[in-house]
Amino acid sequence: MEFFRFINALLGFPEEERKKKQSSGGTHNEHKPEQQTNAQHPSPQPIHHTPPSHSSETNNEHKPTPTPIRPAPPPPPPIIRHLKTHGSGSTTTHNEHESTPPSHYIRPMPIEHEPTPSPQPVTHNSSTNNEHESTPLPTPTPPNSGNEHKSTSAPTPPGLHRTPLPTPPIHHGIPTQIPPKREPEHHTHGSTNNEHESKRSPIPTPPGLHRIPTPTPPTHQTSPSHSSGGTHNEHESHPPTLHIPPSHHIRPMPIPPNPPIVREPTPTPQPTPIPTPPRLHRIPTPTPPRTPQPTPPPTHGSSSTNSSGSTNNEHKPTPKPIPIPPTPPPPPPHHGIPTQIPPKHESEHHDHGSSSTNSSSSTSNSSSGGTNNEHESTPSPQPMPIEHKPEQQTNAQNRITPIINLSQTKQKTTEKQTSCTIQNLEYAIQIGNLTQAKKILNNLSSNGQISQTKVNMANTVIEGLTKLKMQNQPISNVLSNLTNSFQQMYQNYIRTGKMPDNLIELANVINAITSLLPQYSASVPPNVKAEISRLTVLQQGGSTGTVPAVFFQATEEQRPVSNLIVQ
């Protein structure tokens, strides 16, 4: 007892606690509830080895008598100290527990012999002590006999349990938090993480550690926490410290915003491609039609200066005024329409001014890349096309229109020339187009392109057919009808001696058609031709001897020839 008082005095324990320890054999249990309360927060990860450890403590509570055995083993305290030093890294907690460990170490000696450590529900009370009890767990893993034979090893775990409890919530809390994060699949350890977080809420690192350590040390801590209860946990307390810095290093990696670096290049290329396409579209339109380039230097030296200035403007991307590009688009319709038309017609005269401007601007654009040359070169061609292009258009139209008029007049004249021919007249008569034939006949007679005899024959044909109402009929049909009617009328004239009114007209029409269109003379029978010739002689008042048929008719009809001729 004096030895313990001396140790307590050295360690700074008050005598009241010592008396309490002496009075109650469950001093080991007194500290255990504290450990339980402290440990309940860390992580209730019930390792399967915990039940055997509790029975000894519960038995210790009921049996405080084994206190007299305390003085027997004074040497173990240094062993406990070494174990404690290995288990935890804080000296203050060692001093607190070093006073108690001898008592604990002594107490479990008889306690374990008497009750044969049945399941120790110490972990049930301090279910979270799995972190700290990880070391004793290997001893209880053998059945109860293991604890009986190793009485010294059994007491050490309680000491180990006590010493790490104050400090480990920092060290062990981290690993315990880490493995449950490694094992979100089971979801049983989530509550333990919350308990540890409640204790370590003031520590800023664990929240980051909860996020990051999940990927980093799964292999190290998941396997030991489940494979073996104790020694691995002690060693795990150290690896977490090793794993913590990587977590800190890992955290800053996502934190630095890389997106701004990606965003910076993206805006820069956008302005450059936007202006380029309009330039490409604008520049080629003026350049191809305007080939003459010798004139530009004298006419527009300013464009050459613009080319030199434009190179300076290239280095100044800021002067790219977007409001200016909209202004050039309206002229392009003016550029496009006139530029295509005038170079074909008036490139020699009127385009030299505008072409020189455009050619110089195109050369300047080609030399300088055309960043701002658009704005420099476009203003020069804009006024020029307005001045020249309308004139060019009007001139071109004036030139085009007279050509069309000439062609029309030529066509008209050719139609007149072709139409005013005897062949056309004959064709019109053949098809029965008497009106057109009349017009052609008048033109031919006025121009003197036809003989008077043909004019008379054509007139007789046209007038006779119109009078007989045989218009718009082919001449072949007309002849057949005329010959038939003439024969009938002529027979009647011979029988009666009375000449029909239309007989001579029919004879004249048939005679005119055959004379005007000799190809149709074969369609007229020869007797009809003879009869027609007789009638024509009688009509002309020829002598009696000239027309023998008349005498025959007179003798046949017994009428005087004079009467026949008169009729």
UniProtKB/Swiss-Prot annotation:
It is found in: Virion. Transmembrane segments: none annotated. Residues 65-79, 253-278, 285-299, 319-335 have a biased composition (Pro residues). Keywords: Virion. Disulfide bonds: none annotated. Residues 7-393 are annotated as: Disordered. Residues 219-231, 300-312, 354-372 have a biased composition (Low complexity). GO terms for cellular component: virion component. Its main location: virion. Residues 180-200, 343-353 have a biased composition (Basic and acidic residues). This is Structural protein ORF567. It comes from Acidianus two-tailed virus.
